[in-house]
């Protein structure tokens, strides 16, 4: 396979750590609440102690609840890392597409979120070349 995507959820375990260590790119999706950003900082510091090059991280700030919460700039300052992309709040479009078992990029192709997801896919491919 050219690409293998594994969703490791929220845990670091004896099973997930070797996968993380062998990965070419690690995508971390974080929310806009202070607690999530703080935990992400702890995780990135831990990954660094394992010898993982933090340049392999591709951070995405997910605005799942609108404009509330921490800004991209503030999150980058806390993390001392660049956030590569911010996913916009998609309102009810995401839920509608999900409930109808349709990709958001097909159900709402002109939605800003759909555009960002297509851009994300392109950027990830470029990052791994």
Q: Residue spans of the language-model regions?
A:
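Inter-motif core of Ras-like GTPase G domains
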Residues: 2, 10-34
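Well-ordered beta-strand positions
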Residues: 3, 25, 81-85
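Short glycine-/polar-rich loops that comprise or flank the Walker A/P-loop
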Residues: 23-25, 53-57
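G-domain G4 guanine-recognition motif of GTPases
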Residues: 31-32, 57-69, 86-93
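Beta-strand-loop-alpha "switch" segments that mediate conformational coupling across diverse proteins
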Residues: 63, 75-104, 117
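NTP-binding/hydrolysis catalytic cores, primarily Walker-type P-loop NTPases
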Residues: 99-129
């Amino acid at each position: 396979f050219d690409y293998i995507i594994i969703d490791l959820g929220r845990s670091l375990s004896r099973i997930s750590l070797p996968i993380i260590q062998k990965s070419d790119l690690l995508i971390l999706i974080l929310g806009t609440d202070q607690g999530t950003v703080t935990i992400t900082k702890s995780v990135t510091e831990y990954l660094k102690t394992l010898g993982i090059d933090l340049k392999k991280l591709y951070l995405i700030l997910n605005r799942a609840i609108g404009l509330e919460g921490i800004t991209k700039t503030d999150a980058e300052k806390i993390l001392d890392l660049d956030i590569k992309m911010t996913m916009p709040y998609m309102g009810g479009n995401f839920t509608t597409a999900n409930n109808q078992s349709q990709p958001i990029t097909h159900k709402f192709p002109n939605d800003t979120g759909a555009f960002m997801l297509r851009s994300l896919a392109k950027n990830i491919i470029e990052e791994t070349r």
